[in-house]
Amino acid sequence: MAGISVLVLLGLLAACVVVVVLLLQFLARASLGVGGDDPLLREGLGQVRRRFGGCLVAALLIMIGGVVLNGLLPGWLGIPLTLAPGLAASVALLGFAVWPTAPQVGTGSTSASLIRRSAWSFGSRRLFAVPATVAAVYLGALATAAVVASPDDAGLMRAFAQTQGNLSSSATPFPGSFYGLPLAAMTIVVVVSAYAALRRMASSASILSSATEDLLRIDQQWRRIVTSIIVRISAAALLGYLGVTLVYAGSAMHRASDFTVNGGSATSWSAVGWVAAIAGLVSVLATAVLSGAAIAAVLSLRDQAVRPSGVPVGQSR
């Protein structure tokens, strides 16, 4: 198992570096706009803010329900609380995707653009790479945890055990398949929900009522703003899951390896546990930053009515 622990440690460090680099680029580039004011865009974004606000309230109620249900069902060993954040994020994203289109702003006449739009039309590759990379790293972490997990006293794969000679130790909870399978399924649900929200945003009717060149630019600007918010919400949910899972996994690894043989640590898994726990705490902190940025962006949507300087229509900064 020593060789496996070294591989896990190297993989964990490499994954952390990739995620941190992408996250820093994301935070540096995900500005919602620059200076100026446009009444039409301001009014349209106010309508979008109400959509997002309602979805975030629904997500908060889901979180509260998960906490309450977790207390009422202790025999479920934390599964309701484990799934609540992902379910809340998915409800917020899917709620935005299915919410009726906001009424148009303007003269009352309608128009349509012949430009074909997809879910990826209003963001850069680096923007979308953040949640995609976090999801891939998280699924890889869950798969690795499932391989090294051990059964607990009830036979559930939610423990981490170590044996050295006549000594043995185990610790729970550990994200083996008991937690890993539901978490992997929830990760896929969050990704699909984010895609649905992005596709809805890209394909929905304009919040403006005509298609002059100037209003077309405004329409594409609000779509870029909403894309940034959707990506922030999904990235925060996935990064939060990754962080909390690493903290619990690292804690279990360290506690199960916290005995000595001939004056030294029993296994190298103790070091892996420390690294995983620290990486998890950093991820949780980054989640708080992303979540705060997403909520602040929603609350200030009307103030994001901007005229981008020197940015061609259809391109992001």
List the predicted regions and their residue ranges.
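Short membrane-interface loop/juxtamembrane segments of multi-pass integral membrane proteins
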Residues: 39-45, 109-124, 163-170, 214-230
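Juxtamembrane inter-helical linkers in multi-pass membrane proteins
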Residues: 35-38, 106-117, 200-223, 304-314
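Alpha-helical transmembrane segments of multi-pass integral membrane proteins
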Residues: 121-150, 179-195, 231-243
